[in-house]
Amino acid sequence: HAVAKGVITKADQLHICYCHSPIRYVWDMYHEYLEESGLTKGLKGYLAKYMLHRIRNWDLISSFRVDYFISNSDYVGRRIQETYRRDAVTIHPNIDISNFDLCVEKEDFYLTSSRLVGYKKIDLIVEAFSRMSNKKLVVIGGGPNLEKIRKIAGHNITVMGYQSFAVLKEKMQKAKAFVFAADEDFG
C-alpha cells in the first residue's frame, strides 16, 4: 500500500520501493478527491485538508528512506521524479494474458469497464456515446457512481453493473474496442 515505503530500515538494509504511484489523494488528485468526497468546505473539509497535508509531508519525508525506486511504468516514473525528486527504473508488472484468446469476429459495440468512481471518467465516456447514437457502448463495473451512470446513459448504452470475470472476458473479446478515459498509473 501507499505507506509501505515509509518502513524504517536498519543501516545495513537495502530499501527498494516498487512504486505503483505516489499517493494520488495527497498529490496529483488532491482536489478531485476532496470534491468527490464533499470535503471542500466546513469543519470536515478543514480537518480533511489538514490531515491530507500531514500525510503529504510524511510521504515526502519517507521517500528519503528509500534507496532505490522502481516504477511500474515510465509515466509513474515521471510522477516519482515530480513528486519526490527521485529517479526510478521502470519494470513493468507481469500481466497474465493466457485467459484472453483472440476473437476475430467482433460484434457491433464498444466496451468500457472500471470501478465506477469519478476519477475513472466513465461518465465522460457515457456522455460522449450518448451523443453518438449510432455507436453502442457496454459499461461493466460497480461503484458509487453506478446510478449516476445509469441516469445519463442514452438508449444506445447498456450499463451492466458488476459482472463476473467470465462475462467481462466474453465482452472484451467481442467488443470492437475498449474505451478508456482515466489518467491511469500504468500509463
Model regions and ranges:
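Nucleotide-activated donor-binding/catalytic signature segment of Leloir-type glycosyltransferases, i.e.
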Residues: L146-E170, A177
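Acidic donor-binding loop of glycosyltransferase active sites
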Residues: Q173-F186
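Active-site proximal beta-strand in glycosyltransferases
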Residues: T9-K41, V89
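Membrane-proximal helix-turn-helix segments that form the acceptor-binding/catalytic region
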Residues: E35-F69, G77
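Conserved donor-binding/catalytic core segment of Leloir-type glycosyltransferases
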Residues: D101-K120, V126-I140
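Acidic anion/phosphate-binding donor-loop and adjacent secondary structure
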Residues: R78, E82-T83, V89, N94-D108, ...
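Short hydrophobic "strand-cap" motifs at the C-terminus of beta-strands
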Residues: N72, N94, T112-S114, I140-G141, ...
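Alpha-helix capping/helix-boundary segments
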Residues: A2-A4, Y75-G77, P144-N145, D185
